[in-house]
């Protein structure tokens, strides 16, 4: 009996410590992401061209829209640290709600977006955080294209991982994989803790 109580207490302690470590890592990840996004917003705002003609007006508009995307990213990413408390994970309905909010954010900057969420198991906040990063990486890439439509599917890959598939449709004639924005996308994905293929 005493041995069982000790084993249970040991298990509970290890679980609590693992949860604390995961929470600490998530807070650090979110903190670093918000710092990078804030730096990006400051860079954008400090480099706005003066309003001299229609071309500069259009360029300012595009840059301000990009800053708006960064604000939305910060809002969604920061909410993860609050959303994880007292929760057993992010289930399909909760992820679908997040995806709908994200799609709504993107539509306000003329990136048409739709998603299918087909996960069967709840996901940890750190997984959702990595998915946010990847979806926004694709969204920033999509914003560089002509009349973009971004579609993505999130489903279970195996018992321990999920798979995010994204497809971008645009009116561009050029090969988008050869653009500087595509190189930025690949560089961003390389910096994430994800396996990917473009």
Residues covered by each model-derived region:
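Conserved ATP-binding N-box helix of the HATPase_c
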Residues: 36-49, 124-153
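Conserved short strand/loop->alpha-helix "switch" segment adjacent to the catalytic nucleotide/phosphoryl-transfer site
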Residues: 15, 19-25, 108-139, 143, ...
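Conserved DxG motif in ATP/Mg2+-binding regions
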Residues: 160-173, 198
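Conserved signal-transmission helix
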Residues: 1-23
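Conserved DHp (HisKA) dimerization/phosphotransfer helix of two-component histidine kinases, i.e.
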Residues: 32-116
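ATP phosphate-binding glycine-rich loop and adjacent ATP-lid/helix-beta elements
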Residues: 172-198
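Short beta-strand/loop element within the Bergerat-fold HATPase_c
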Residues: 55, 151-165
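Amphipathic alpha-helical regulatory segments at dimerization interfaces
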Residues: 101, 105, 137-144, 188-191
